[in-house]
Amino acid sequence: MAIRLNKVTKLLNVGLSTIVKFLQSRGYLREENPNTKISPEEYEILNQEFHKDKHVKLDSEKLSKERFQKENYDKDKLKQIEEIKMGIPRSNEFQLLLTSKLDLDTLPQDKSQTTIEIKKTIKTSEIKEIKRENKTDILKERKQIEEIKNSYLNKQQKKSNLLSSTDSTINFTITGKIDLTTINNATRPKRKTKEEKQKEREERNKKIVNIKTEKTTQVNAGKKSIASTQTNIEILKRKKRNRIKHEKVNIEQQNISTIPNPKNKHFKFHKPTYKNEVSEEDVQKQIKETLAKLTNSSLKKGTKYRKEKRDTLLQLKNEQYKIKTQENKTIKITEFVTANDLSKMMNVPVVQVISTCMSIGIMVSINQRLDSETIDIVADEFGYKTEYVSAEAIETIIDDENENQEKELVLRPPIVTIMGHVDHGKTSLLDNIRNTNVIAGEAGGITQHIGAYNVKLDDGRKITFLDTPGHEAFTAMRARGAKITDIAIIIIASDDNIMPQTIEAINHAVAAGVPIIFAINKIDKHGANPEKIKETLASMNYLVEDWGGKYQSQDISAKKGIGIQELLEKVLLEAELLDLKANPKRYAIGSIIESSLDKGRGYIATMLIQNGTLKLGDIVLAGIYFGRVKAMFNERNLKIKEAGPSQAVLVLGLNGAPQAGDTIRVVKTEQEAREIAAKREQLQREQSLRTQKLLTLDDISRRIAVKNFHKLNIIVKGDVDGSVEALSDSLIRLSTEQIQINVIHKGVGQISESDVILATASNAFIIGFQVRPSLLTRKLAEKEGVEIRLYSIIYNAIEEVKSAMEGMLIPKTKEEITSNVEIREVYKITKVGSVAGCIVKEGKIKQGDKIRLIRNGVVIYTGELGSLKRYKDYAKEVTQGCECGLNIHNFNDIKVGDIIETFENIETKQKL
C-alpha cells in the first residue's frame, strides 16, 4: 500500500530533502512534495538505508517515557507520605463489648461495692504481623496506635452514655469528690507550671509504653484469641518516634512490579509498574498461542463447515482481487507500437519512456516504432505486463522455414548503410561510388530521405547502399537503416569533431549488432587532422585497427576519390567474414524503406528484399495494407520483372501507404491477405482508441495554473512517410507548458480538400513538406481562411513553427527608468494647483511620461506627468542638467526635496 512522504519522514526520523535525494539517486524520480506517495518497495529501500535513524528515535522515545514514569512515581510517593503525616483514618475498628449481663435482682444492697468491668475486645482478624523492614511499616505501626486511641475514646463515650440511661438502682463506687466552689471562679484556667507539665508528659509516656508492650505480646502469641483487658485509659498523645534509617532504593534498577502482601489489608498504595519493552517475537508468539486456543478441533460439524465456507469465500475474493489488479497492470498492444502511444497506455510521460530506452542503449524518438523486446523492457521498468493482441494475425502467415535448405542458399550482396553528421560527405561518397550526382537533386544539398542504391563494381560484385539523413530530426530513419543493414559505414569529417548525430549513429549500429567501418573524410582539405578523430574515437572506447583495435578505418576524400577503392575492399572483406546467404527460391520477405503517394501511379513503396525473390503479380502484405505487384522499378527508374535478395525496388500496386519499417511478405492468395489486413486494421483502431487521452480535471487545473495556455493544431503532409514522421516528431518536441502542439493528422501525398475541411473544423493550419495543393484545394483554403505553408527543407519548417509559437506568447513587460528629477521649489497657482520647479539630475524627462513621486525613499504616488515647461514655453523633453517646471496630473501634495522618477513600460517578445 502506498504511503506519503510526510509520514515516512516521521517514521524514519529523516528529512524530506534527504529522502528525495536518496530516491533520485536510486532511479526513482520524485518531486520534493510531502504529499507524494511512494510504493512499498521504495519504503523498504528507505527503511534499509535509514533504519539507524529510526532506532535512534525509538530509543529517545523510550528514555523519555521512563523519565516520565519515574517523575510520576516520585510524585505519588510524596503524596502518600503527606497523607500519612496528616493522619488519614484507616479502616481498623475496635469494638467495646459486654462480656456478661448483670442481674439487678441479685445485686447486694451495698451500692458501694457495685463495679463495672469494661472489657476491651479486639477482633483477632484485625491483628496482623507487623514487619519493620522498611519505612512504610513504621509509618503503618504509628497509624495503628493512633487509631487504637481514637476508637477506644469513642467507644468509652458511647458506653458512658449507655450506662447513664440504665436503671437508677445501679450503685456506683465513689472514687473521689469535686469541689464545686472552685468551678467558674475565673474565666480562664490557671496556667500549669513546668513541673506539672513534665509530670503529665511522663505519665502519658508510661501508659503508651504499656499499651505497646501489651500489643506486641499479643502479636507474638500468633492467631490466638486475645484476652480482654480491663483498662481505664485517659486521653493519650503520641510521642515522636526515632527514625529508622534504611538504604536508598534505586527506582530505575528496580524494574519489577510491587506485589501487595495479601496478609496486610492496610496496603493502600502500589509502586508504579515498569513493564519491559515487548519484542516482535513475543507478539507473534502470543498471536500464535491465541489462535491455537481459538482453533478448537472438537468443533461441531455445522460450525466447522461454516468456518471452512467463510475461509473459501475469502480466499476466492482475494484471488479475484489479485486477478483484477494484474489485469489493470496488463497492457494490450500491437508489436510495433510507437513510443508516444506506449507512454499514453502506461500513463507516464513520453520523456521517461525515451530516457528508459536510452539507458539500455536504444536511441528512439517520439513517433518511432518499438519492437516487442524493447516494449517488454520498458513496460517492465514501469511495472506493466504486455500482451500482444496482434500475435493471432502474425501467426496466420505461414513461414515455410523448410524452404531455407542448405543446398539452395546462395551468397547475397551486403547491405551497407552510410551514416554520419550533416554535411560530413555521406551523399558525396555515394555519388563518387555510383558516378552520379545525387546532391544536385536534394533541396538545400541535404539528404532528407533514405536512398537505396544497387552498385555493381568492376569485378562484378554488388553492394546495396542505404544513404540516411544526418539531421537530428531523422533519428527514426537512422534507426531503421541500422536494423536492416549488414555493415555500417560511419563517415566523419577530418576537419570537424565527432558530432552528436555521429555518436547517435554509432549507438544505433552497436545496438543492432552491426559491424562498423569508420570513413574519415575530407583529408584533402586544409586543416584536416585524421589522427585527432582516431584519438577521440579511442577515448570513446572505439579503437581502430591502425591503433591496435578491432574497428576498420579508412582515410578518404569523397570529392577527389582518394581511398574509395580501399574502403570498398574493406566492406567486401567484412561481408565475406559475415558469410551472408539467402534463398532466392522462396517467397520474398523484406522491409519498407519509404512509401508515398504519386498522382499518376498511386501509392508506391520503396522496399528492400532481405530473403527470397519478389516477382510481378505477387500478392504482398505490408502492415494493414495489401495489393498485387503491378510494376517494379530500380533506383534508376527502370522497369524490372523480379528482385532478388539485398535489392532495393520501387513497388506499385498497394492499396495504401505503409509505414516505414513495416515488414512486407508475399502470401499465397488475395483472400488471405485481405483477411489478415482487415484483422490488423481492426487491432490498430483498437490501439488508437486505447491511446486517446481525454481531458481530465488535472489537465484543466494545470491549464488554469499556467495562465494563457494555448493549443496549436497542425496537419502535416509530405512526400514520403519517413519525412512526415521526422517532421511530426520535431514539431511535437517543440511543445512547452504554455503552448501545446497537436499534430492532428499526418499523411503522404498531395494536400487534398479533406485536409482543408479538417483544418477548418479543428482550427489548424497545414504544413506541406515537398508537396503542393491542387488548384481546387488552394481555392477552398482561401475561402475557409486556412493557412497552408509549404517547405522543402526541414530546418525552415521547424524554425517558422517555432516563431509562430513565440508570437502566441504574451510579451514580457519590462520597466525602464528614463530620468531622475529633484524638486527645488514649489509654487501654488490658482486654478492650476501645485507647480514644481525642478532640475533634471539624470536621464531625459518627456511630456506624457509616467512618474513616481518619492519622499524620503518611500513611493508616495504613481501617476502621469501633467505638463512640462522650460522657462515659459511648453517643452516636449528636458535633458540632464537643465531646469524645468512641471505639475502632476490630479496630485498636488508635493514638497521641496521630493524626487520624481519617470519610467516607461517596454514590451519584449518572449522566446521558447
Curated annotation (Swiss-Prot):
Residues annotated as binding GTP: 420-427, 467-471, 521-524
Residue ranges, annotated region (G2): 445-449
Stretches the record annotates as G5: 557-559
Annotated stretches, region: G3: 467-470
G1, as annotated region: 420-427
PROSITE patterns found in the cross-reference section: G_TR_2, IF2
Entry keyword annotation includes GTP-binding: yes
UniProt keyword list: Cytoplasm, GTP-binding, Initiation factor, Nucleotide-binding, Protein biosynthesis
PANTHER family from the UniProt entry: TR-TYPE G DOMAIN-CONTAINING PROTEIN, TRANSLATION INITIATION FACTOR IF-2-RELATED
Name this polypeptide is given: Translation initiation factor IF-2
Gene transcribed to yield this protein: infB
